[in-house]
Amino acid sequence: MEKKASEGLTTRLLHADRRGGVEHGATHKPLHPSSAFGYDTARELVSVFKGERSGHVYARQGNPTNAALETKLTLLEDGVGTVSFATGMAAIASLLVALLKRDDHIVASRFLFGNTASLLNTLEGLGCGLTLVDATDAADVERAITPRTRLVFVETIANPGTQVADLEAIGKLCGERGLLYVVDNTMTTPYLFRPKTVGAGLVVNSLTKSIGGHGNALGGAVTDTGVFDWSRFANIAEPYKKGEPRGWGLLQIRKRGLRDIGATLAADAAHRIATGAETLALRMDRACDNALRLATWLAAQPGVKRVNHPGLETHPQHANAKRWFKAGGALMSFELDDARDCLAFLDRLDVVIKSSHLGDNRTLAIPVAHTIFWEMGAQRRQAMGIADSLIRVSVGIEDHEDLRADFERALAAV
């Protein structure tokens, strides 16, 4: 069955499985837990190994269930292909290990998720150059580029400070310099924003977060948008220069990243994530509305020093966020005034769960300086804009009145 050109994203996601071919009239692709795949003849097996025909040989580098999810993710990002991984961090690590060599240079935002920042520090210790920049200013990115620079890495909306990268200008800069532009789209999701529109060559998503949405599966993905010319990338090995250049990068990521590192997405997790993705638009609309309403209310409270959310007109990058994104996202953060204890405040919350996760249907909160960023040290946290009293809130889809009442009670108690 052919899709209609006028169909919306949710319609296409809901009907992707049956249009891709399913047995017995099923509306979902089946779960394939097999770890290996057999063929009738040795020649067939050899041809799949050599990439001469499509198929699966060993589930570490792919299986039909993961492939069905990858098809949906490619649709979401309007890309040319996707490789799925066990987690979002596995996706980032595998991408970087697969594409970089010793002495290559990375330009990255200094406003990054703590584990991503830690990974980049590890790569620096292994011989890659690293320059951290203010990604809200493309001029700062440009100053950091050297002849050894291979890629630029940013997040759309930074976690947890909500800084919005200068996405369009950085994309133009990378295009002019022939650099690979990698954008982590986790905070916005492909429903709110497609990095392809600003020139991103590769897009990373943590599927554990809003795309899966239900907090019941770990996963990550790298999608090739088709924008980057891989024939210009010096690090593509000869075995992966097969067919048109647009497929080279993702093939090397699947082989040197997924196959060799082995951070494979479990088939049952892929199945749950694919189901969750079908309601992405509905969930994001609700969560983003809740987040903006809660942020607006918090910003007016006397016990709150600062609120960070791109949807607020007071946000430094509000104009860009409004121009690029359908909404400001479901993540916000805020600081209490100096007289209030952020840990005591969190203890007073009842509906909101104290958890390090985000992108869940449930609203979650965490004191970031004391938990996920404590390893960074005070000086590094200060450079990243993370105050000791900063609380990150991943806003879910609960009834807004219940969330506001929960925060109101907690503020009154401290």
PLM features per residue range, with description:
Residues 1-53:
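N-terminal glycine-rich, Lys/His-bearing helix-loop that initiates the first secondary-structure elements
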Residues 78, 148, 303-306, 351, ...:
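Glycine-centered tight turns that cap/initiate beta-strands
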Residues 120-122, 147-150, 283, 340, ...:
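PLP-dependent enzyme catalytic core of the Aspartate aminotransferase-like
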Residues 2-5, 13-15, 19-22, 82-302, ...:
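Conserved PLP-enzyme active-site core in the AAT-like
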Residues 272-282, 329-337, 392-396:
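Short, well-ordered beta-strand elements within core beta-sheets of diverse protein domains
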Residues 18-20, 33-39, 209, 226-228, ...:
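Glycine-rich beta-alpha junction loops
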Residues 36, 41-93, 115-122:
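Conserved N-terminal alpha-helix of the aminotransferase class I/II PLP-enzyme fold
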Residues 261-263, 285-286, 291-362, 376-382:
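Conserved small-domain helix->loop->beta segment predominantly found in fold-type I
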